[in-house]
Amino acid sequence: MAETAETINTTISSPPPESESSTTISAMTDPTSQEAASKDTDLTKEAESEKKPGGISLRIWPPTQKTRDAVLNRLIETLSTESILSKRYGTLKSDDATTVAKLIEEEAYGVASNAVSSDDDGIKILELYSKEISKRMLESVKARSNASVGNGSVEDANTDASEVSKDDAGPASEEEKSEA
C-alpha cells in the first residue's frame, strides 16, 4: 500500500504544464523563448552543415584573440623566466622576450593559416601552429645562445637555428650527456 501512496504522491507533485503557468511569467519569457528557438534552429542548421559520418564536427581554428594572447604570454614567460629551456640556452630580457614572442606567434599563425583546408576541423592546423611555435622558439633561443657565447658569427648562429636537427628530437649525444 505504501508503494501505491508514493506513486500517487509522485504523480500529484509533478510540475504543472507550461500552459497552466502564470501569464506574467509566460509573457516575459515568450520573446526569449522565441529567440532561443531561433538560435537553436540556427545552431541545428550549422551543426547539420558541418556533420561528418561520425557525428558533429567542431571547428577549433582559427583560435580566438584571447587564446592567441594567452599563447603569447606563455611564450614571453618561457623566454624570460627560468625554465628547462633557459637552463640550457639562457633567458631573455623581458622586452626582448616580448618582441621575440610576438614574432614567433605571428609567424606560426601565418604558416598555420596558410595550411587551412575547408575539409579540416582545425585539429591538424592547431597541431601545425603548436609545432611551428615550438620550432621557432627553439631556433630563436639557439641563435641568441650561439651568438652570445661566440661559437661563431651571428650569421652562422642564424644558419644553425634555421635547421632543426634530428639530434634535438632524439636522444642526447655523448657530448651532451657529459655536459649534464
Curated annotation (Swiss-Prot):
Key word Nucleus present: yes
Cellular component annotations (GO), alphabetically ordered: Golgi apparatus; nuclear outer membrane; nucleus
Stored Pfam families: WPP (PF13943)
Annotated segments matching region Disordered: 1-61, 140-180
Bias (Basic and acidic residues): 37-53
Expression by tissue: Expressed in roots, stems, leaves and flowers.
Subunit structure: Binds to FPP proteins. Interacts with WAP, WIP1, WIP2 and WIP3 through its WPP domain. Interacts with WIT1 and HSP70-1.
Record's comment describing the protein's domains: The WPP domain is required for the nuclear envelope localization.
Name by which UniProt lists this protein: WPP domain-containing protein 2
Source species of the chain: Arabidopsis thaliana (Mouse-ear cress)
